[in-house]
């Protein structure tokens, strides 16, 4: 077996461990948090967490895709890697300053956020962690072993802290701070590894590189914003319209779905930089790799969707417990998402983005975001968390369909 295949498989395994720590380790505390906080306070927790995820999305700006691709193409040149690294870091510093100003204004001026200001600010460590955690550097250089180490250590650290310090329904802010601190700890460990390995040179500030970095990531940022509109945004709108209990039911079911779906991420994250670099050298080999990825992801995603559909009642009963009756219905409605998202990841990220169709990719996700806005208000008003689940499913169906049509119409998978 050649070195490239061994390297790819090794990276998939490392990323599987990373995703296991990201999704499965928090599941050790998930049932405890759900039961300790109760449906209403767990809903408040989810509402504030979703708000902070929007802030993180702004700071992330799509660099996990664009910077990964840039690093993958320049992995053998320390000077180029250094230039890309500092351009992204300084870009993120600009974005985090804007974010903190906006967050301060929001918690002062919006009554719903003012009421939960302490809880919202308890999630800020995750924002800082996103700034200093260069996942894109590790992925671009295909050095997943170190990414695995930093992720596992940080996730393990928060487990005992949750059981020790979160004891009553009122400990929402403590729970938020502990959960969000995992990203910060992971970022500190990752930066120490980067320095120790000598992957980057001295600090270089180039305004031209910062502007170019922001420009390169703009269309992906618009795309991720649109995705957040119909994923994270649904939780926020549901909270405003239907209240924290509905958010608690939706968030509980969606957490189970994300835990299973997240197991697909090792394959998608490991193969993306490999596809990017392979297409540059040999398009035919790149297309063959994409088709293999499509087969693998669709089969696994389909199996996960069946597990969620057929096992919804058991999964909710075991992981959540009593008081979350509507979570079973929500989980059944959103059960097709792992299959749909596995397809849209291939057609959108692995095909459209690697072929430089960033604008078209953005337009599809913007259309999906607009559809979610049209559906979310009437459906959540009428059906609360069930309406939110229907909105999410309908939006993902549109995304997958449009991406599939674009790829086929432009014959992007024809060698």
UniProtKB/Swiss-Prot annotation:
- What keywords are assigned to this protein? Cell inner membrane, Cell membrane, Lipopolysaccharide biosynthesis, Membrane, Transmembrane, Transmembrane helix, Transport
Keyword Transport set for record:
yes
Per the UniProt topology annotation, the Cytoplasmic ranges are: 1-11, 63-83, 139-173, 242-295, 350-362, 407-415
Residue ranges, Periplasmic side: 33-41, 105-117, 195-220, 317-328, 384-385
Q: Where in the cell is it found?
A: Cell inner membrane
| Keyword Phosphoprotein set for record | no
Q: Name one GO biological process term.
A: DNA damage response
> Pfam families this protein is in?
Polysacc_synt (PF01943)
InterPro entries membership = Poly_Biosynth_Transport, Polysacc_synth
List, alphabetically, the GO terms of the cellular component aspect.
plasma membrane
Q: How does it sit in the membrane?
A: Multi-pass membrane protein
Q: Which residues form a coiled coil?
A: none
Q: Which residues form the signal peptide?
A: none
Q: Which domain of life is it from?
A: Bacteria
Q: Which residues cross the membrane?
A: 12-32, 42-62, 84-104, 118-138, 174-194, 221-241, 296-316, 329-349, 363-383, 386-406
Known pathway: Bacterial outer membrane biogenesis; LPS O-antigen biosynthesis
Q: Which family does it belong to?
A: Belongs to the polysaccharide synthase family.
Q: Describe the function of this protein.
A: May be involved in the translocation process of the nascent O-polysaccharide molecules and/or its ligation to lipid A core units.
Name the UniProt record assigns to this protein: Putative O-antigen transporter
Q: Which organism is it from?
A: Escherichia coli (strain K12)
């Amino acid at each position: 077996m050649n070195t490239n295949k061994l390297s790819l498989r090794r990276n998939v395994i490392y990323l599987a461990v990373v995703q296991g720590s990201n999704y499965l380790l928090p599941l050790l505390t998930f049932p405890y948090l759900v039961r300790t906080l109760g449906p209403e306070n767990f809903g408040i927790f989810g509402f504030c967490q979703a708000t902070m995820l929007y802030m993180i999305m702004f700071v992330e700006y799509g660099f996990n895709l664009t910077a990964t691709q840039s690093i993958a193409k320049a992995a053998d040149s320390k000077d180029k890697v250094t230039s890309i690294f500092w351009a992204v870091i300084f870009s993120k510093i600009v974005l985090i300053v804007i974010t903190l100003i906006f967050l301060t204004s929001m918690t002062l001026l919006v009554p719903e956020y003012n009421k939960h200001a302490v809880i919202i600010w308890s999630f800020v460590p995750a924002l800082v962690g996103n700034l200093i955690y260069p996942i894109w550097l590790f992925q671009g250089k295909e050095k997943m072993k170190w990414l695995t180490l930093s992720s596992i250590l940080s996730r393990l650290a928060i487990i005992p802290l949750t059981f020790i310090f979160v004891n009553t329904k009122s400990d929402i802010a403590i729970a938020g701070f502990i959960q969000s601190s995992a990203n910060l700890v992971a970022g500190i460990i990752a930066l120490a590894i980067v320095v120790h390995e000598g992957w980057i040179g001295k600090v270089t500030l180039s305004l031209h590189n910062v502007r170019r970095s922001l420009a390169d990531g703009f269309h992906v940022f618009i795309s991720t914003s649109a995705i957040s509109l119909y994923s994270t945004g649904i939780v926020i709108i549901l909270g405003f319209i239907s209240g924290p209990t509905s958010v608690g039911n939706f968030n509980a079911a969606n957490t189970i779905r994300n835990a299973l779906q997240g197991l697909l991420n090792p394959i998608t994250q490991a193969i993306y930089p490999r596809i990017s670099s392979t297409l540059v050298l040999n398009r035919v080999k790149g297309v063959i790799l994409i088709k293999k990825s499509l087969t693998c992801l669709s089969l696994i995603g389909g199996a996960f969707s069946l597990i969620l559909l057929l096992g919804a009642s058991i999964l909710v009963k075991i992981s959540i417990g009593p008081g979350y009756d509507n979570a079973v219905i929500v989980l059944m409605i959103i059960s097709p998402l792992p299959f749909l998202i596995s397809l849209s990841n291939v057609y959108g990220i692995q095909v459209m983005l690697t072929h430089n169709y960033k604008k078209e990719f953005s337009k599809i996700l913007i259309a999906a975001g607009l559809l979610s806005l049209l559906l979310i208000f009437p459906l959540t008003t009428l059906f609360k968390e069930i309406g939110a689940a229907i909105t999410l499913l309908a939006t993902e169906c549109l995304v997958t369909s449009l991406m599939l049509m674009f790829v086929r119409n432009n014959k992007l998978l024809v060698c």
